[in-house]
């Protein structure tokens, strides 16, 4: 992206700007690959969080995904309509809604794995094994920095 420096607020030469651009491109490519198997970006993370087949509360799912409860509620509504998850009130506490991946959703596991393998391959094309390892190490450090731990 070519933005004149005088109009860029001085941010276009920062690493954070580069990360933002890469993140945007990566998410777009993930959306494209997942749409080929009938999913939307983010739904694969829900599948991962529910992969063991057990049910969890919506609050626990939000915590696992690192998102707000309201975000999960909206996402689950459409996923339930698509037959990917089921939701039921907890019999011991009617205030709690339990979520479970349906067999239809769990059956997509291999296709999700393949889509992510393809995304990973495309993302790191042209990098040597050492560069991939170095990138992974650096991204872990950046993630740790942003998590504030």
Q: Where does each model-flagged region fall?
A:
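Residues within the alpha-helical elements of helix-turn-helix
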Residues: 64
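N-terminal leader segment of winged-helix/HTH proteins
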Residues: 1-37
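Charged, amphipathic alpha-helical coiled-coil/dimerization segments
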Residues: 2, 27, 77-140, 144
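Short, locally clustered residues in the helix-turn-helix/winged-helix DNA-binding domain
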Residues: 20, 48-52, 140
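Short capping segments at the starts of secondary-structure elements
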Residues: 53-57
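Residues within helix-turn-helix
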Residues: 58-59, 70, 77, 97
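Pre-recognition alpha-helix immediately N-terminal to the DNA-recognition helix
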Residues: 18, 29, 45-48, 107, ...
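Short helix-coil-helix linker/hinge
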Residues: 37-43, 71, 102, 127-129
């Amino acid at each position: 992206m070519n933005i004149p420096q005088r109009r860029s607020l001085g941010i276009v030469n920062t690493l954070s700007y580069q990360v933002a651009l890469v993140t945007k491109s990566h998410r777009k490519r993930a959306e494209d690959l997942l749409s080929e198997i009938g999913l939307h970006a983010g739904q694969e993370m829900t599948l991962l969080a529910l992969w063991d087949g057990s049910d969890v509360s919506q609050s626990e799912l939000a915590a696992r995904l690192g998102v707000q409860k309201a975000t999960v509620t909206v996402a689950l509504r459409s996923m339930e309509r698509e037959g990917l998850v089921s939701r039921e009130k907890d019999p011991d506490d009617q205030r709690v809604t339990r979520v479970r991946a349906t067999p239809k959703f769990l059956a997509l596991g291999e296709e999700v794995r393949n889509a992510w393998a393809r995304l990973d391959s495309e993302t790191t094309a042209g990098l040597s094994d050492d560069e991939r390892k170095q990138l992974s190490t650096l991204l872990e450090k950046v993630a740790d920095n942003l998590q504030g731990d």
